[in-house]
Amino acid sequence: FDVICVMRERTRFDEDLLRQLPTLKLLVTGGMRNAALDLKAAAALGIQVCGTDSYKHAAPELTWALIMAATRNLVVEANALRAGKWQQGLGGDLHGKTLGILGLGSIGQRVARFGQVFGMRVIAWSENLTAERAAEVDVTYVSKQELCAQADVLSVHLVLSERSRGMVDAQA
């Protein structure tokens, strides 16, 4: 192959695999970051790697579905229905609660909008976020400690790296 388009982030292209593709000139990935690609090996082998503008709706939609499922006890309720029981409980409300967002980039901003639509107070923190930038999307900037202390729901939207690994722990 001269060109390969990688559609899944989990498809590994390590040095061994890249060496088995001697005619490969271009490796295209959905999104701008793909940890499964060995960029150093690709460069050493003369393979150009580039990304596309990612589809930014899937992650926020899945995030919101998981928040709703956890808050409303969806799995327990679905299992009760399957067992012939009806509505064991309503779960908790989101309206009036605080949504904390760690990482207010494009995905975090979309999740913030979902929270706002549901009547949640939305707060955020990340290392490069400013109060002014947060205010542009009607979000309140807080410290990391305030974020963890005040959030009823904490949603993390950071690239996993050495800098972000372990950022949320028991001390947070």
Question: What does each of the following model-derived ranges do?
Answer:
Residues 33-36, 54, 85, 98, ...:
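Residue-level detector of alpha-helix initiation sites
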Residues 80-88:
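A short, charged, Gly/Pro-tolerant segment at domain boundaries
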Residues 89-172:
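Rossmann-like dinucleotide/phosphate-binding beta-alpha-beta segment
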Residues 18-22, 43, 82, 95, ...:
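Alpha-helix boundary recognition
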Residues 34, 56, 81, 129, ...:
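Residue-level detector of flexible, active-site-proximal loop/helix-junction positions
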Residues 1-8, 119, 132:
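N-terminal glycine-/charge-rich "phosphate-binding" loop or analogous flexible N-terminal tail
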Residues 3-78, 92:
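Phosphate/diphosphate ligand-binding glycine-rich loop within oxidoreductases
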